[in-house]
């Protein structure tokens, strides 16, 4: 039995073309340039290395740079006027409302950023909870520890969750814990359970899953 429908936030609830994450990326580079006093090229290289080695720039800073305050970083990179990038999405609100399963947000960002995005999209009232990067002790996706803490917070097993994400990399650790995985904005289902063209197409997949729970091994 499924108990939670878990959504990533950025570029899952709104399309990549919105350009918001690109702007956050620009601000991540700016933070590294200004606070670590790196030339732009080195900042870019460091960001890439953190992404490959630690999953996110934040995780890289937390692990390798105890002199950097993660809260200062998180505030800086998300300090963006969201209304320039996003607007209300009544169809998304309607879609979420039509799914009876409790919905939660699982994001590498902060709860403030998540609440701001949900408010601009007009879907804040559709989510039972927001698990942000603070609540998993700054262990970002795709590190396995983030997903283990998520399950612990929700008091569920992986196979009781459906995880919706725009990133294959962030779905795989969930799948390894037994979650049913839905990749948004992709036609490449090779490594995940389902892939859909856009967020509204999640609805029929979830509806079918709720009608037909997956086979379980019985002891
Ligand atoms: Mg995302």
What kind of feature is each model-predicted range?
Residues 91-100:
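Catalytic-core regions built around general acid/base machinery
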Residues 1-91, 112:
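N-terminal helical cap/lid subdomain that shapes the substrate entry/recognition surface
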Residues 84, 88, 106, 139:
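Residue-level marker of regulatory loop/turn positions in helix-turn-helix DNA-binding domains and
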Residues 1-3, 97, 104, 110-219:
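Asp-based, Mg2+/Mn2+-dependent phosphohydrolase catalytic module
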Residues 82, 101-104:
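Generic structural signal for secondary-structure transition and capping sites
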């Amino acid at each position: 039995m499924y108990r939670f429908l878990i959504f990533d936030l950025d570029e899952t609830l709104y399309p990549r073309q919105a350009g918001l994450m690109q702007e956050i990326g620009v601000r991540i580079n700016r933070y590294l340039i200004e606070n670590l006093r790196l030339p732009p090229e080195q900042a870019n290289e460091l960001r890439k290395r953190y992404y490959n080695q630690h999953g996110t720039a934040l995780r890289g800073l937390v692990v390798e740079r105890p002199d950097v305050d993660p809260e200062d970083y998180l505030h800086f990179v998300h300090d963006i006027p969201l209304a320039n990038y996003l607007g209300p999405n009544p169809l998304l609100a309607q879609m979420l409302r039509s799914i009876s399963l409790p919905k939660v947000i699982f994001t590498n960002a902060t709860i403030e950023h998540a609440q701001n995005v949900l408010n601009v999209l007009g879907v804040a009232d559709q989510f039972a909870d927001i698990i942000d990067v603070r609540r998993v002790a700054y262990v970002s996706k795709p590190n396995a520890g983030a997903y283990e803490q998520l399950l612990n917070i929700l008091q569920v097993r992986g196979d009781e969750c459906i995880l919706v994400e725009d990133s294959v990399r962030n779905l795989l650790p969930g799948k390894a814990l037994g979650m049913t995985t839905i990749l948004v904005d992709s036609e490449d289902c090779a490594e995940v359970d389902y892939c859909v063209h856009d967020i509204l197409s999640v609805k029929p997949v979830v509806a079918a899953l709720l009608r037909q729970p997956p086979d379980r091994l019985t002891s």
